[in-house]
Curated annotation (Swiss-Prot):
Function: Regulator of crossing-over during meiosis. Involved in initiation and/or maintenance of chromosome synapsis and formation of crossovers.
Protein's name according to its UniProt entry: Testis-expressed protein 11
GO terms for cellular component: central element; chromosome
Organism: Homo sapiens
Subcellular location: Chromosome
UniProt-listed InterPro entries: Spo22/ZIP4/TEX11 (IPR013940), TEX11 (IPR042861), TPR-like_helical_dom_sf (IPR011990), TPR_rpt (IPR019734)
Tissues in which the UniProt entry reports expression: Testis-specific. Not expressed in adult ovaries.
Keywords linked to the UniProt accession: Chromosome, Disease variant, Meiosis
């Protein structure tokens, strides 16, 4: 079977009307949809079908009968109803299927032939329209509702035209009108959603006219208008909201049995509120009338409160207000409601009525267990109006009642404490610490010995803060001790312990408090809200601690606080400032310390702080230029500091590297001028040197690879900087290039880098390389774990060539280079294989002889070594039956013998004798004349 996706292609057409192939495919599409399994192509097929249905009409489907079309439509509709949650079809696609089914059905003439068919079409359009309405597609919803109205009109005509009993006809007309009523309601919903007030109101008024014939729809229309009123009020459309709420009330009155007085009162209260929000001056009377009517319908506390609120908006006299509040008392409203009315009066500056009402309330509810609420509110209102003496009298009254059996509830107690603390905080803010203590003392009096909660410890800390500001140290210590007894793990408790220790000059105690404070901050963040420190930043306490310690001459304590602040603060500027302050304190002290474990610990401490500063510098600054400039300035300071610390670590290379790398990182935030680039290059060079040394000393292959790989990365970065500087033309002869070359060669050689040969190809061609550079390459090439004898040989050849070009030649350096070259070319031992032909090696010996013969400065020990080397080579050749070559090399040794002075007598006799025996043996074709004793070493 062809998939639905493929079939839908038949429906696509560029023409406005459907092609024959389009229509022919429609049947297959629908059949595939309703018979196919849960294919992943189904959602796409539905969407294509929905988009193409607009191009299909009855004329284009002339070859298909009405019965076939109706069957397709019904099957599609029913299939959409059966789709469950396991299908890939969403709710909107189900609506689209219903829509297509309805459009197909409406093309059938049979759908309009019978009343039953028309009713089915009405039902489908109403349902689809409501679904589109709920989905937010109002245009298609309106289209469906219009189609439903048209079908209803057709159905009504058919009812009139046929002859039926009057009773049956009446019932059928009522059914049609009921459907019409629902369609009008839906159309009103759509219009409101689209902001079309005129169309919505016309639909609703039309529904309202139908209520005489459809009384059962009254409640529905009443709630619909109420919902419209709520929605438009939220959107500040007060005029429209007033209309809808008025209609809701009018309609609700038509059927009070189903609506009820509570609902009518609710509508009227919302209407009154709407008038207030619209214009409380212009519509004051309407608002008051609405709320009065609401209270008449159903008296309730919200209605009474709203009425008082409206009265306070107008120019109501105190006498009228007093009458209104007395009415509330006569209605036996609860205490909390009366208190809310009193507060409302106070908030609108009607103090005389408000305080009088409070007095009446107190008398009215004096037997209530919540009578304390009246006194507390009275106290609060007095304090807000600066009537502190009267407020204190009320507090004493509350305390007396509390002590004599009229105890406050927990809720009332919390309320009272909040009022007292608020008043204390106000006094604290204006530095009236004595007055603040009085209010805190009132709060303290209400605590019993078995009620020591966290708020009690907070109270003790607040009192301690006041005592400290009044310089009453002993009382402050007592308060803090009490707080510590109940809440020792509180950051603010530890902060006050710290402050007292600093004031007393007890550095040890202060340090312990700072350490404890840091531990608490590490464990969990405090959300305390004492009078000190910002609530959102517990680390601010560390900043305050550092500042307080400095102000009181406790530098060591301040250093610890700054260190913790830099470690824990998330504030960029705060961390940088803390690190700078700490460094300014520590640098002079560390500079004077002798090399010791203590100095190393201090250096580690500084390194940690500088790394923290680097992390903060790495975080984004603001986009303003000033912020970028500020970061550069900060980085410049830290860069220089790290550099200076690195220089001080000459006895600790590892630590020195850390500071140089840190200086390099800091410099990346600075403008890349020549000075900064040179500094970066130097930092990296020093780091490479340390990493190479670490690699040489590494105890495992893994460690060595790690150090060397890190060095290689640093070398490559350093090379980039050096090449950039060379472009300026002022660093062409910089010795750094040769150093980098040697470093890179050593790293690549010891890492057994496959790119080593290609790297050296460019090295050999570099101009101005010195003999020392080539000799160093030779040494590195043979230094374990590297083993590149051919590279070493080539380097020594180049070095020797450079020595020979010197005028005058440095014969001492020449002799050493020759020694190394010969020793590498012809290793000791009869089993070794030469790295180059002996003819080439012979040339080295001849070259050495030529220089020996021209100067008396050639070191005799080197001449002796060459003599022994050539003699032993001759012996080696003899052992390989290369007799002519043996005679040649031994003869060469005799030539070196002639240039010896102090060592000549020791070797001359024996060598001449052995050489004679060699010549005689060769001429007589005898066996070997050399045995093990024929090999010589320089020490023989």
């Amino acid at each position: 079977m062809i998939s639905a996706h493929c079939n839908l292609r038949l429906l696509c057409s560029s023409d406005s009307s459907a092609s024959a192939s389009q229509v022919a495919g429609t049947t297959e599409v629908v059949e595939n949809l309703v018979t196919n399994d849960n294919s992943p192509n189904i959602p796409e097929a539905i969407d294509r079908l929905f988009s193409d249905i607009a191009n299909i009409n009855r004329e284009s489907m002339a070859e298909i009968t009405d019965i076939q079309i109706e069957e397709m439509a019904v099957n599609l509709w029913n299939w959409a109803l059966t789709i469950g949650g396991g299908w890939l079809v969403n709710e909107e696609q189900k609506i689209r299927l219903h829509y297509v089914a309805c459009k197909l059905l409406s093309m059938c003439e049979a759908s309009f032939a019978s009343e039953q068919s028309i009713q089915r079409l009405i039902m489908m359009n109403m349902r689809i329209g409501k679904e589109w309405l709920d989905a937010g597609n109002f245009l298609i919803a309106d289209e469906c509702f219009q189609a439903a109205v048209a079908s209803l009109e057709q159905l009504y005509v058919k009812l009139i035209q046929r002859s039926s009993p009057e009773a049956d006809l009446t019932m059928e007309k009522i059914t049609v009108e009921s459907d019409h009523f629902r369609v009008l309601s839906y159309q009103a919903e759509s219009a409101v959603a689209q902001g079309d007030f005129q169309r919505a109101s016309m639909c609703v008024l039309q529904c309202k006219d139908m209520l005489m014939r459809l009384p059962q729809m009254t409640s529905s229309l009443h709630h619909l208008c109420y919902n419209f009123g709520v929605e438009t009020q939220k959107n500040n459309k007060y005029e429209e909201s007033s209309f809808w709420l008025s209609q809701s009330y009018d309609i609700g009155k038509m059927d009070k049995k189903s609506t009820g007085p509570e609902m009518l009162a609710k509508v009227l209260r919302l209407l009154a509120t709407n008038y207030l929000d619209w214009d409380d001056t212009k519509y004051y009377d309407k608002a008051l009338n609405a709320v009065n009517l609401a209270n008449k319908e159903h008296l309730s506390s919200p209605g009474l409160f709203l009425k008082m609120k409206i009265l306070l908006k107008g120019e109501t006299s105190n006498e009228e207000l007093l009458e209104a509040v007395m009415e509330i008392l006569h209605l036996d409203m609860p205490l909390d409601f009366c208190l809310n009315i009193a507060k409302l009066l106070m908030d609108h500056e009607r103090e005389s009525v408000g305080f009088h009402f409070l007095t009446i309330i107190h008398e009215r509810f004096k037997s209530s267990e919540n009578i304390g609420k009246v006194l507390i509110l009275h106290t609060d209102m007095l304090l807000q109006r600066k009537e502190e003496l009267l407020a204190k009298e009320k507090i004493e009254e509350i305390f007396l009642a509390h002590q004599t059996g009229r105890q406050l509830t927990a809720e009332s107690m919390n309320w009272l404490h909040n009022i007292l603390w608020r008043q204390a905080a106000s006094s604290f803010e204006v530095q009236n610490y004595t007055d603040a203590l009085q209010w805190y003392y009132y709060s303290l009096r209400f605590y019993s010995t078995d009620e020591m909660d966290l708020d009690f410890t907070k109270l003790q800390r607040n009192m301690a803060c006041c005592y400290l500001n009044l310089q009453q140290l002993d009382k402050a210590k007592e308060a803090v001790a009490e707080a510590e007894r109940h809440d020792p793990r509180n950051v603010f408790t530890q902060f006050y312990i710290f402050k007292i220790a600093v004031i007393e000059g007890n550095s040890e105690r202060a340090l312990q408090a700072i350490i404890t404070l840091e531990n608490i901050l590490t464990d969990e963040e405090s959300e305390d809200n004492d009078l000190v420190a910002e609530r959102g930043s517990p680390t601010m306490l560390l900043s305050l601690a550092a500042q307080f310690a400095l102000e009181n001459g406790q530098q060591i304590v301040a250093e610890k606080a700054l260190e913790y602040l830099a470690q824990h603060s998330e504030d960029q500027e705060q961390v940088l400032t803390a690190v700078k302050c700490l460094l300014r304190f520590l640098l002079p002290k560390i500079a004077e310390m002798p090399e010791s474990e203590d100095k190393k610990k201090e250096m580690d401490r500084l390194l940690t702080c500088l790394n923290r500063a680097f992390v903060k510098l790495s975080q984004p600054f603001g986009e303003e230029a000033l912020s970028l400039e500020s970061r550069a300035n900060e980085a410049q300071w830290f860069r220089k500091t790290a550099w200076n610390l690195a220089v001080q670590c000459d006895k600790d290379p590892v630590m020195m590297r850390e500071f140089f790398i840190l200086s390099y990182k800091m410099s990346q935030f600075c403008p890349s001028d020549q000075v900064i680039l040179i500094a970066r290059k130097t930092c990296l060079l020093m780091a490479v040197a340390v990493d190479l040394e670490q690699g040489r000393k590494a105890s495992t292959a893994f460690e060595q690879t790690m150090f060397l790989s890190r060095a290689l990365e640093e070398i490559q970065t350093c090379n980039d900087i050096h090449n950039f500087l060379k472009q300026t033309g002022t660093f062409s002869n910089d010795s750094c290039e040769k150093l980098l070359l040697l470093y890179e060669f050593e790293v690549r050689a010891k890492l057994n880098d496959p790119l080593l040969e290609s790297f050296l190809e460019s090295v050999w061609e570099l101009p101005h390389l010195e003999t020392k550079t080539f000799e160093t390459i030779a040494i590195i090439a043979m230094e374990k774990p590297a083993h590149y004898p051919l590279i070493a040989l080539k380097a020594l050849k180049k070095a020797l060539l450079l020595y020979k070009k010197e005028e005058p030649i440095d014969i001492s350096q020449y002799s050493k280079c020759m020694h190394n070259l010969v020793n590498l070319s012809v290793p000791d031992g009869a089993s070794n294989v030469e790295l180059c032909p002996l003819e080439e090696v012979w040339g080295y010996f001849e070259d050495a002889l030529s220089h020996i013969s021209r100067t008396k400065d050639y070191p005799e020990m080197e001449i002796l070594w060459l003599m022994v080397k050539s003699w032993n080579t001759g012996v080696l050749m003899f052992s390989r039956s290369k007799y002519a070559s043996a005679e040649k090399w031994c003869g060469l040794a005799l030539r070196f013998l002639n240039h010896l002075t102090s060592f000549k007598e020791s070797y001359e006799t024996q060598m001449n004798m052995l050489y004679s025996q060699l010549v005689e043996a060769l001429s007589n074709n005898k066996g070997p004349v050399f045995h093990e004793h024929g090999y010589w070493s320089k020490s023989d």
